[in-house]
């Protein structure tokens, strides 16, 4: 009989729990198989699966892609080899399923029918784990989209059986013992976007357990500890659970605070016991969650207990006694708070950062969380992945749940909540649409942004009147690098790092920053200068560091510094205080330091460019300096149009004429004129329903223009100095007394 040996690889996210094996076309030809046929997979045990064709990237690779449950049934791991041959499957007359010991499952009234519908046409061998997806309308609830492992206790006839419409499916309530291998049901297929991290953890954890001889040959000790660190919600604990399931090693879990006891010496005793149990049961894995809570830096803690626990952990992990085949995996989101003695080779040899997923990772995670969901055709997961910058796995899970809840709300009016059973016709009609995800997106924000999240202003470029040159400048500097980075790559240049908008008050600098934030779809962090300054030494700099760290984490991001002059005045001048000097230093290192500012754009606005520290205004930091000056006649007319679009105007009103007369008025002045004119009209007649030209003229008498000749001269002078590429001349401040800056 034809058979081949293939290497086991991880299944595609959508195949998890479906009993599918993916083979390349050559193997299918060699074994005379066509898609939909049944094959036997022989590892340490024999199981069966249905064959499908693999994607193009897996052709000619000698691999078979099967999910975690099929791997557990065949008792093989990823990277091991299995024998494949065509199976003679008979129709199953009866199939008896029971939950494993540790699963708590209650079966509802129509549970057997539900399960049968899910496993129709699936091959089963006795003692197989048969995963059943729990969906939102399932009679036994786990979280939707998670597989519940049931065990095939007996099949009639024996051997490879196929579940058909005629099969009698029985469910037994009492759990079946002797099945250690069902685990918590979490496999590598349940983890999206961490391909490299999984690979690194596996070579550290699985290799020493399965093939210790490799390390003996190389004459080295296998690694003993892995520290997973990264922002909350990225999947550190999930990865540890999957590793425990897939390696078939004994698994011991320590939740940080649980082992701390009030009695002297008891915390250390508990820790010693766990390590001793692990040694007796080796090969084994000890997982410590929230490591920073039980092993903080000893110089920072006041309590004696924590110090003793840290010392005990250090001796257990690398003491005089060998600790056998015991690997310690720990997770923390505050890696800098962990005692440095733990972070050396021999204790935690490897530190693996589990970061925020990129676009491809987010799409994988979305596929995992929506695989049990009836999606309508208009849901495009790759566009969704594109819209969820900065989301971690936990945020995406929350997004999927929120979308499903919104879909449910649509059907709620049709459901009679007093009835026990919901009609199957309604359940089959339930579907999650694109609008549900859109609505969910507005409610779920990335968890890393919670402290700094700004509601995105709904302001577009159309709301910014005039200023065409300044607008184009800002678009080139900010929108191109974020939306079309390939332009810069093609030309072989780096995009600008930061943009400084300067100009008289009221010209629309902040408005432009808001429009940019809205148009780029980037995350927007707004920093108001004075908010960052603190009376405690080091706090202001820390706030700036954290702002930039968050921005890098949830990139692409636009950081907007309003009133930069209050935050970064020139250093070394009389009257300057130490705080602002330290803040300037921190800003300089963040903007052009050793760390890359990938996909983070910085925009700042100021109306006093002359007092900003000159080191900030050089290329590589704020390298685009854009003057937002007074609008021309066309611009003023546009601004008036924007501000009077909701105002009923009389027939005699000519906005063009008003624009021609409004020389020296900036955007905020014109907005003021529009408002004053409406109030004038109401003064004349409380029941007035339109605003006439006379009202506008009266309003112009009351509103003074912001811009004077002296002021414009001052800004032109500043611009000339910028173009001469020296920082603004400090002496210009002596002349600024009569310009209106007191």
Swiss-Prot record:
Pfam families: AAA, AAA_lid_3, CDC48_2, CDC48_N. Residues 723-734 have a biased composition (Polar residues). It comes from the Archaea. The keyword Transcription regulation does not apply. ATP binds at residues 230-237, 503-510. Residues 722-742 are annotated as: Disordered. Keywords: ATP-binding, Nucleotide-binding, Repeat. NCBIfam families: CDC48. Belongs to the AAA ATPase family. CDC48 subfamily. May be part of a transduction pathway connecting light to cell division. This is Protein CdcH. It comes from Halobacterium salinarum (strain ATCC 700922 / JCM 11081 / NRC-1). The gene is cdcH.
